[in-house]
Amino acid sequence: MKLNTLQLENYRNYEQVTLDCHPEVNILIGENAQGKTNLLESIYTLALAKSHRTSNDKELIRFKSDYAKIEGELSYRHGTMPLTMFITKKGKQVKVNHLEQSRLTQYIGHLNVVLFAPEDLNIVKGSPQIRRRFIDMELGQISAVYLNDLAQYQRILKQKNNYLKQLQIGQKTDTTMLEVLNQQFVEYALKVTLRREHFIKELETLAQPIHAGITNDQETLTLDYVPSLKLSNYEANQSELIEEVLALLNDNLQREKERGVCLYGPHRDDLSFNVNGMDAQTYGSQGQQRTTALSIKLAEIELMNIEVGEYPILLLDDVLSELDDSRQTHLLSTIQHKVQTFVTTTSVEGIDHEIMNNAKLYRISQGEILK
């Protein structure tokens, strides 16, 4: 897939701008705080109906404006399609081909993106919450079923936590409702857990040769899914898995009542990256962590193409010039002539000349694209 045009109205520091996009590489050059990252963010937001930089949509609306609008025309193998996102201080509206979508699960997946920014090192060295969000953002783009199952799980988790809190403080004493919630909870917890486990295996298979290539076969990368629900046999039938998880919850019912919170489930999952058998979060150098993050991002690109049949759009926010020649070479081999890429940078120095030869440059200054 390709983004042909991007139009912004009252988005961040942009009053009104239209970007005619190059099908291969688009390089956004400018000093800091001029709006380069805002442009990349708008593409990400158009794809996932949420920003990666803020959870408050109101922050996306230009100062003293009542609304923000993002519109993009996409090209697929089978044709073109417009996507629109309209944001007000009361909420947001999304459209596919000019038709409003009542649920975000119907919208997400029409535009797939992979973002690589300096903070993506936190996927390796940050908290479990960051890694869970990474899994959900990437998996949600390629599976509407997963996105729906995750939403159902989060809804039931919230209900269960509310009831556990009432039991803890004595507002409720009957655990019958909790047993009903656990039945629903287990159904979706298993769906999320099993899909995540499969996703991590697929990602590992694709990331390992990429990582080996970047390190000249000096390092081996493995990914370990660390689920909160440690199932004895992931291949068991559904009824056996449900019985196993229900037994776990029943055995820990008193602990959950005392704590007033759900102690088991995908909301407590983690993911471990290991380089030569050592946990990269604890023992990896910054170079190893950067290589691991890059390998994962490049593997995401390939996985999305396998699952969706279209390459995603790659967003590189101020990271290209930080990659050494070896890493840039492997990045180039992945994206060249296949993946439309948007790059932000303060200078083109240090960017591979082959990337520059297939690029269109845009100079960004104070929320405007200079011709």
Swiss-Prot record:
GO MF: ATP binding; single-stranded DNA binding
Main location: cytoplasm
Keywords assigned: ATP-binding, Cytoplasm, DNA damage, DNA repair, DNA replication, DNA-binding, Nucleotide-binding, SOS response
Subcellular location: Cytoplasm
A GO cellular component annotation in the UniProt record: cytoplasm
Protein's UniProt keywords contain Nucleus: no
GO terms classed as biological process: DNA replication; DNA synthesis involved in DNA repair; double-strand break repair; SOS response
Binding-site positions, ATP: 30-37
Stored Pfam families: SMC_N
Listed HAMAP family: RecF
Function: The RecF protein is involved in DNA metabolism; it is required for DNA replication and normal SOS inducibility. RecF binds preferentially to single-stranded, linear DNA. It also seems to bind ATP.
PANTHER family (UniProt xref): DNA REPLICATION AND REPAIR PROTEIN RECF
Protein family per UniProt: Belongs to the RecF family.
Protein name: DNA replication and repair protein RecF
The encoding gene: recF
